[in-house]
Amino acid sequence: VDRPTRTNEKALAINLDMGRYGSFAEIGAGQEVARWFYRVGGAAGTIAKSVSAYDKTVSDAIYGPTRRYVVRERLEEMLRYEQSLTLERLFPQRGDSTAFFTFANTVQARSYQGNNECHGWIGVKFQSHPRDEDSQIILHVRMLDSENQAQQEALGIIGVNLLYGAFFLYHRPDELVESLLDELSIERIEIDMIEFSGIEFRHVDNRIMSLRLVQLGLTPAAMFSASGKVLQPSEVLRKRPVLLERGRFSPVTRVNLDMIDKARAQFADDGGAAVQADDIVSVMEITMSNLRADQGEVDLTDFIGRAEVLGVTDHIVMISDYFEYYRLAAYLRRYTDRRCAIVMGAGALRQIFDERYYARLEGGILEALGRLFKNDLHIFVYPQKDPETGTLWTVETLEVPKDVRHLYGYLVERGFLIPVEDYDESVLDIQAPEVLEKLQSGDEAWESMVDERVAEVIKARKLFGYGAR
């Protein structure tokens, strides 16, 4: 790496860059980022002001009233307010030679009782060059250290990393993301959302940046909306019922959509007062193992194709590194105490009962299924035709290995495995590999196998190799 990785070196490099000058506004865990710049010397060349409005009344007087303080909206208002104030006060005398910036964070660190969720929003709004339009990077972190002091230290380091990245790596966003955990580890900080915006990042696709977070191990899962806007998982899933479908989605077929639509309707009906249809968060999940090609690399063009077709279906997209369903279930439970359900085809359900997948677990398949179904999680099982024989697999007819038949029967009996009832029989013959093969070979039959909106976007943007032959 031809750049500094140590925090003090980065802070000093920024202090010695006379062309950058700005403000620090930090709430919730001390002035941990500004402190680095004071500590290494030369801060007068960088810091116009550092402020911490700890009192809520004082904070509201500066940034406007709010109900919640550790949220994205508060961070963005802090960045907007402080940057405009800096420009108003300092632009007339040094605007021609100075690129101004504002760093801000709003954080909930470990409390005195020590039982709260520790997380925060961190951001920088900056000019790359004097008189430039602003660019911005914001991120959400979970702080995993058990001691308050260690959390403060980690926050200071990631803040310096973000500022160094914004000033010196803005033209290499991949490297910028990778550098955020210099001198930190994923045991200390998880970054579950990052968003680039503004003039310098007009060509950055935030969906790819979300993918990078998971790819680099900075978070186990990242989300974006149908329109491609990055989402912070707890703000989406918090206290909501969740329905999730996992798939390859290359492309998303009529079967995929019938699965989630019919399961959603049934979820709302079966859930009674506990599950309102409008309240359900529908998520289409792609795992990293489904994204990696044969060589273990992720094809970005293929990834964007999948994101584009999922976008027109109006579902939230999640990229995760959870191969095992029981780990996925634990992740959802981190954010919501409402009912959660996964919908899958009968073929995928059979794999869940394959004991080979659980060889690493001390308690084997029993432990895995115990973890999966605890806390009121259910699986909706969509019927699937055997491509060889044409036999229809359902909850009732699925053949699982002899050793686990009683276990399977128990889960059916207890209502953990629920058959999807009102399915569309006309889509059962659609096989995803066949759709892709027809699409790439120029056989127009593929169009009837996907939703009209999906077909339109594939043809318009020539996704998945359409029109190549």
Positions of predicted regions on the chain:
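Nucleotidyltransferase catalytic core that binds NTPs
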Residues: 1-469
